[in-house]
Amino acid sequence: YLDFASGYDSFAYYYQNQMHVFEIDKKEVIEDKRQRCKDVDIENIQFLSIDLSQENWINTLLQSDYQEDQLSISSMLGLSYYLTKDEFKKMLKQLSKYLLKGSHLVFDYPSIQESKETKINEMLAKEADESMKAKYSFAELKEILNQCHLTIIQHENHQTVTEKYIYNYNV
């Protein structure tokens, strides 16, 4: 399980005995998370300090315990908001070379249609002194994925994802 831009997500800790987890984020986030988790018994979780906007980010992943000959799930929730379109495309292109066919990628993206969710995310980013660097149409995103040899299997809107996956998890 590759958790890109893992932040302070705790998903990995619930499933650490069932899979190997790679928490991937900026150096300062990973260092802070390591410090906060130093007294927690953590197995099968590897923290990787990676700047995904850099060309050579993939080398850090490949030098870890990541095994490209095994199926994996890559979570990139919230990531596409903070990379330029070119950075996001390059990242996907590099990653796709090292994903075993049948692996899955899960991500959300800011839409060019000014949805309520996109406006909320823009406001949250601004409050965190960040800015959203890109917005996508579905057709544009589909083309980017195609160029990276990736295929959309399922596309759901914010409301459906919340109802199916998040609501029951948080109740």
Spans of features found by a protein language model:
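Alpha-helical subdomain
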Residues: 2-171
